């Protein structure tokens, strides 16, 4: 070793750090962020809204179509899978889609997700039997997951930072609107044409979506896929983790559909599936820990308190949200004898004020750069609204069921999009895609968990109430009668007993929602009180630079919360 080498210099007289600095100076500067504006932004957002409308419609459209489906296939034991298959794949595949968006062109991955969704729609629409319909619904869920996750990701890619919160709020409003009108369309198609049109209708809408994606989904130049070999990408997809997560969710779904409804909770198969759910869930987290950076849910991403508290907040907030979304129409149809369409119309206050709350929080976040206060306010208002919904009775007036919807809707809307905004805003650019996938997984798996749990709560408490007031009635007949058909199938004392049983089940589901809303208040207090990073691409004047200094050194802030 020469003296120069020993002293950390080369024969040319430059120290190693000097060379590193020189090389860094010689490198071309990173491209300045370019964001979509004007017509291009409007075209991209229109495409995102249309594809979200398409994907979210099918989450709830099958609910009112189930009576017609069971008339054709005569498989009552498969009823839970017609909706559950979609939810299971949306939740379990979300992190996988996040990885695909990281390593491939966002336009290509988005296009593939839409195509998979449309293929699933064709399979479901043309299904000759129940098994084929379930496969079609699973494919729809798989494609839906990529479309919904990609929609949020594209907003973060193409929109200026100060506009993102507002646009994500608008996107959430479209999502909620779609899930509300889904059952309306499902009921209309099933009554007037055939349930198969619940799926055929996706094709004439999906065609223009594909064309719009091809024409307008151009990602800004500063967003580039991460370089990786095919072997590396395959490892990143974490297929063992995906398989364990999916099978654990299937076990839980089966156990909750059996328990107390078609089989006793003490039945061997019910206990076995619950045990398998626990074992597979533990195995999933063990595999994720072993996989490290290759895990579909990299546990390191969840380490910062800002991340895991927001992810948990989003998970629990959807507990409160989904129960009201699905069981408020059941209340209207069963207790008030309304049609599927009328029940949807009477649920519009919830949807309208959810949209208003979402857009309001997006606007306020853009102005104040605060997050936690809106999550706290969201939890408080949602708790009050859920408590009022719990008080609904058989003879409740319009004012009694519209007022709580307004409070609950604006409450849930205020906080629903905040966790996604927080995680995307505090993530490093290369981590935005997988972080979005993890957040979507939390939101979707909460649907898979809690919608199934709510169905079990509803059925078990309804049957318990029915057994106490009308022990001679056939519980299977009550379970298999559609909510809108209750007043037609039962009369007199039987109808009174069934309505009382339905109300008992619905109130317990609303109590479940109330517990979730109250828990979000507690969770919001654990979320770090931090302002978003400067929402502009870079300081353009002294005032913004000074504001950045007030927030503290950028490097320190990134160390604390960036993922």
Curated annotation (Swiss-Prot):
It is found in: Cell membrane. One of its GO terms (cellular component) is plasma membrane. Its main location: membrane. PROSITE patterns: MFS. One of its GO terms (molecular function) is transmembrane transporter activity. Keywords: Cell membrane, Membrane, Transmembrane, Transmembrane helix, Transport. The chain crosses the membrane at residues 48-68, 78-98, 108-128, 138-158, 165-185, 197-217, 239-259, 270-290, 312-332, 345-365, 374-394, 406-426, 438-458, 509-529. Residues 1-32, 538-563 are annotated as: Disordered. InterPro entries: MFS, MFS_dom, MFS_trans_sf. Residues 547-563 have a biased composition (Basic and acidic residues). It is a multi-pass membrane protein. Notoamides have been shown to exhibit antitumoral activities. Notoamides A-C show moderate cytotoxicity against HeLa and L1210 cells with IC(50) values in the range of 22-52 mg/ml, but the IC(50) value of notoamide D is greater than 100 mg/ml. Moreover, notoamide C induces G2/M-cell cycle arrest at a concentration of 6.3 mg/ml. It holds the Pfam family MFS_1. Efflux pump; part of the gene cluster that mediates the biosynthesis of notoamide, a fungal indole alkaloid that belongs to a family of natural products containing a characteristic bicyclo[2.2.2]diazaoctane core. Belongs to the major facilitator superfamily. TCR/Tet family. This is Efflux pump notK. The lineage of its organism: Eukaryota, Fungi, Dikarya, Ascomycota, Pezizomycotina.
